[in-house]
Structures are given as C-alpha cells and as structure tokens.
From Swiss-Prot:
ANK repeats lie at residues 61-93. Keywords: ANK repeat. This is Protein MGF 360-3L. Belongs to the asfivirus MGF 360 family. The keyword Isomerase does not apply. One of its GO terms (biological process) is taxis.
C-alpha cells in the first residue's frame, strides 16, 4: 500500500536511506525517531515493510510497530505508520486511554476486532523467530487484558499444537491464559535457542526454571540443557530427565547428555519403545542398552509389530565412539549432528540382504 500523502511518501523514502549520525537531527525533526534513535525501513522477502530501530535491530513488521506505538500512546507514529499502510484496526488490542481510541477512530478503526482478526495478527507478529520479537510478543500478548475478554479457544488449540512434543502439554489446561502464553513464548525461545530471549525469561520468571528444563530436554537443545545443569539447581532426577528426552523421536543430543550424566540407557530404551520412538530405540542400543527381550515384550503389549520384528534380530551392540560420556555441548553437537545409528544401519543392511 502506498502512503496516503506526499509528506508520508517523502518520510518513507527518507527512512530507506543511510543517514550519518551527524544528520540524525533531520530524522528527528521529520518524526523518524523512536526510543531515542532513528527509524529506518526495509522490504523483506515477502514484500512487507519492516521497521528497524535501536530496540529492534532485526526489524519488526509495520503492523507490529503500529500496535506498539498505540500501546505507548505515540500519536505521531500512530499516524505515520497508518499512512504507510499499517492496519489501524489492530491498534484496538492495545488501546489504554480514550484519547488514543478517538485518534484510532479518526484514522478509520472500527469499534472491536473479530476473533479471526486477532488470530491473524497473532500469526503475523509471531512468525519472525528472533529474540527481540519473541520478547515483544510476550509483552504484547501475555498480559493483555483485551485477550482475556475474547473466546480464545482457537488460540489455545494453536498453542497446544505447537507444543505438542512436550510431555506436559496437558498441564497447560490447568493454568491461566496469561501464564500459558508466557510459557509458550519461553518454550519458543528454548526451542530455537534464542539466547537473549532465554536470558530474559530466566531473569523474569525464576519460578519457570523447571519449564525451561522440560523444553530443553524435549526440544533437543543440548546447549541450553548444559547451561541449566551448570547454573541452576535442578529438582529432577537424571532418569526423569532422560525420560523427558526420550518422549520425542530423534532427540539424540539431549538423550546423550543425560546418558553422559549417568542416566540408565536400558530404562531409556524401554521408554522409547513405549512411545514408539524407533530412532531413539536404536540410539539407546548404540549407547549400550541391551534389554532386547523386555523391549520386545513391551512392544508386543502395545501392538508395535514393527518393533517386535526389529528386535527379533540378534545383531545389535554398542557403538564404542559413544561411550566416552562427553558433556561438552559443542563436542556432542559435532559428534551427533549428522549421526546415523550404527544399529539402524545394521538393521538396514540385514533387510537388504534378506530382500536380495
């Protein structure tokens, strides 16, 4: 969308230019100034305007910048971002005084948003996976009183789906909507190893330390798991940690880390079988797990015939290169980032030989 006035067009053109610090006063006089720093814009790969400031060096979407300006009651930027094409209706989620509401009305805002519009804005805002954007999303959504008054069943379902790999997903039913959103953003930060965001949540929400640990184990983030184990008092047994790591298939990094700290590989294999995590099962045998018959019985009880067939072969043994019990996350990542199970390879070869 093109700016509605020549002045807005000129400001948009200026915001795309490199300006030396000596000329920052020009940007300030033109209203291209926010959080004590200049505003610049760029067009992303989806042809969307992105706003970049000192606080958001990686950029935020134009609509997100608008609602933040509304939250701050920054009238000049509300008008500027609207002229640049931001959807003024989204500002309704963050209005906190009548004067700003009247300004939004003058700029064309309706009286209230539909649930579908709220969900659309939620998706638009959260799609940029950076530390600054995850923190911003938390600040915009987690304690927003407007969301408390809207039927957010659809949003809860979206969050459940995105956190489906977490074994404690069902616990999200037992907490407030605000707390659920906070845990969601914290989980996203851990899942993508966003270090600045993790540090922010760690400092602000010390009572969520166990949630951080659960997310690190479940999302295979060995780097954050190592950080937690070395900086936080953990109130969870190492075998319970291994159990959480085994709930999601292909979690080799966190499974190995728990193994290196002393977790039982046989127990891990049984948990992997129970959860039909076949790659984890093979990896546990690589680590020396040898409860083959017990695992076969368990697989038979659950009706996992493919696992029963796999474990019927007498070809599995530990992989010596995994038995050093390394706890350096960089070395673990190097060892396992392209790892293919030695026992899975043996099974593949056996299947090929039988086929031939």
């Amino acid at each position: 969308m093109q700016p509605s006035t020549l002045q807005a067009l000129a400001k948009r053109a200026l915001a795309t230019q490199h300006v030396s610090k000596d000329d920052y006063y020009i940007l300030e006089r033109c209203g291209l100034w926010w959080h004590e720093a200049p505003i610049s814009i760029y067009i992303d790969d989806d042809n969307q305007i992105m706003i970049r400031t000192l606080c958001f060096k990686e950029g935020i979407k134009l609509n997100t910048a608008l609602v933040l300006a509304v939250k701050e009651n920054n009238e000049d930027l509300i008008m500027l971002f609207t002229e640049w094409g931001a959807n003024i209706n989204y500002g309704l989620l963050f209005i906190n005084n009548e004067h700003t509401r009247n300004l939004c009305r003058k700029l064309g805002a309706k009286e209230e948003l539909e649930t579908s519009e709220i969900l659309r804005f939620f998706f638009e805002t959260k799609c940029k996976i950076t530390s600054s954007n995850v923190i911003l999303c938390h600040e915009l959504f987690s304690n927003n009183p407007f969301l408390q008054n809207v039927n957010m069943v659809d949003l809860r379902m979206i969050i459940y789906w995105e956190l489906k790999d977490l074994p404690t997903n069902s616990m999200l039913n037992e907490i407030s909507f605000s707390e659920m959103l906070t845990k969601y953003w914290y989980g996203i930060a851990v899942k993508y190893n966003l270090k600045e965001a993790i540090q922010y949540f760690c400092q602000e929400y010390r009572h969520f330390d166990e949630w951080r640990l659960i997310c690190a184990l479940s999302f295979n983030n060995v780097f954050d798991l190592h950080e937690i184990c070395n900086t936080t008092k953990i109130h969870m047994s190492i075998n319970k940690m291994m159990e959480l790591a085994c709930m999601r298939d292909n979690n080799f990094l966190t499974i190995y880390y728990c193994f290196a700290l002393g977790a039982n590989a046989n127990r891990a294999m049984l948990i992997s079988v129970k959860n039909f995590c076949i790659e984890n099962m093979f990896f546990c045998m690589d680590l020396g797990a040898n409860v083959i018959e017990h695992s076969k019985t368990l697989a038979d009880i659950y009706g996992y015939s493919i696992i029963v067939n796999i474990l019927s072969l007498k070809i599995y043994k530990a992989n010596p290169i995994l038995l050093s019990k390394e706890t350096n996350p960089e070395k673990i990542n190097t060892l396992l980032k392209n790892y293919y199970s030695k026992n899975m390879l043996a099974y593949d070869i056996c299947c090929i030989d039988n086929y031939l």
